[in-house]
Amino acid sequence: MSHQRILLLLMAAFFAWVSAQTPPGQADKSKLIAHDVLMKTTSLSETTIATSSKRFLRLYDAEVRDTVRGDNDVDREERGTTPLLSKVDDLIHKVFKSNPEQAQIKAWMKSRVHPQAIFDTLRLAKSTTKLNDDPNLLLWLKLVAAFRAKNGNQAFSDLDLYYLLLKRSSGEELKILIESFRKTGALKELGKSMQKSLSGSWVSKTLQHETDPKIVYDTLRLQEAGTKLVDSPIFHQWLAYAQQYRAQKGNHWFGDDDMLDLFRKTMPEKDVVTLLHLLRNVPGMKDHGDTMQRFLFLSSKTSRKMMHDVWLNYDVTPEQVFKILRLVKVNMDAVDTNAMFIHWLRYVNLYRSHTKKNVLSSVQMVHFLADTKPLRSEWQFATFFESLKDVPDLKRLAENMQTYLFQNWLHTEWDPKAVSSMLAIPFPTSAVYLPKNDPIYKTWVAYTLYYTERKGGVSLLNKVKTLLDNDNPIGALTAAMKAQ
């Protein structure tokens, strides 16, 4: 028998002995909780359970109601009396004289120690042993079954047990464990109750009363699932309920913005970012997950780096991120109004560095943008790339993409005069007449210098530069047109 079991037995048996020895006048004092030993399970406060929530809870029979309640009316106290070492040996001897397992259960049942306190004492949440190979866990589950049989299922509800076990296992492992309960005599009723509670039978009944998804979320205590929320069948049932609620009431009653707000209020932002990405893999939730990612991106600057980290962790390609952010609909007229596009370009650089792959090279990037934004001309792209040069960490990328366009223009014999007109479309003017700080003018200057260097040599290039520096773009254009 493990040291932990002996410790548990010692505690439980001693508490039972102290209970029997407590004088009548001290009966009330014996009920005081030793806060340094016990950790109470979370229950819903009266302010959380509104009228709709109470109606929601009344929908179910005795077993299913157990799924959505967090009440715990059982005294979870331990006695704080100091142990008398002279009695310890006698207690241990009496307990082990009979069946050790039954003796532990019997002694524990007399102690009024709550199952969660025993769970914490055995450190079951930190155990690395597989669920079905952990004798301490199996013994503890039998204690839970006995505790519920004596005090009622609400004394330690299915949700209490589910979220406690979820701390140490995945949702799939927990599902297998619960199925195995029904093959173990002492756990058969516990397994039946939990399977019924996790079956999702509550969805259709609750929908009839049009209970707000926020109330259902709180009542199901989904925030207790933490980072394992997506693994929980209860969460998937809630998502299905939210979808049906929207279909019945209209999206404006519980839209994606409301769902995002609920997540942000009940979990850390990092967990929200991860959850939104994982929702893309839930049937029927891909578009909603993407929409909430965009909402979060626009409303929280602190979340953007977290989103980059999550995408990298799950190997989300730049092309996929482009779709998630719906950049195909984003205007590309000015850098200062394109926060999402700027961050996407930064993600491209991050992805390259993270994967060590030359994904979306400068040439590929230009073609990708041309394909995804067919209504944008290469002249507009060149101007946008020019404005990107003002973003320090994107300057090199912008120069490379712009240079690729310049190479094509030079190859097709576009001279500076023709380019000056094309860049200004749809305005009835020419780039040379625009202010010097205008991206269109700056793009024309960049191409004129590129053209002159390759067509006219260093001497002519220096002459054109001097004319431009002296605010004489017309003279610079005239000189550049002499290049052969």
UniProtKB/Swiss-Prot annotation:
Induction: Expression is induced during host plant infection. Pfam families: PexRD54_WY, RXLR_WY. Residues 1-20 form the signal peptide. The keyword Lyase does not apply. GO terms for cellular component: extracellular region; host cell plasma membrane; membrane. It comes from the Eukaryota. InterPro entries: PexRD54_WY (IPR054463), RXLR_WY (IPR040786). A motif (RxLR-dEER) lies at residues 55-79. Keywords: Host cell membrane, Host membrane, Membrane, Secreted, Signal, Virulence. It is found in: Secreted; Host cell membrane. Belongs to the RxLR effector family. Effector that enhances P.infestans colonization of Nicotiana benthamiana leaves. The RxLR-dEER motif acts to carry the protein into the host cell cytoplasm through binding to cell surface phosphatidylinositol-3-phosphate. This is RxLR effector protein PexRD18. The gene is PexRD18.
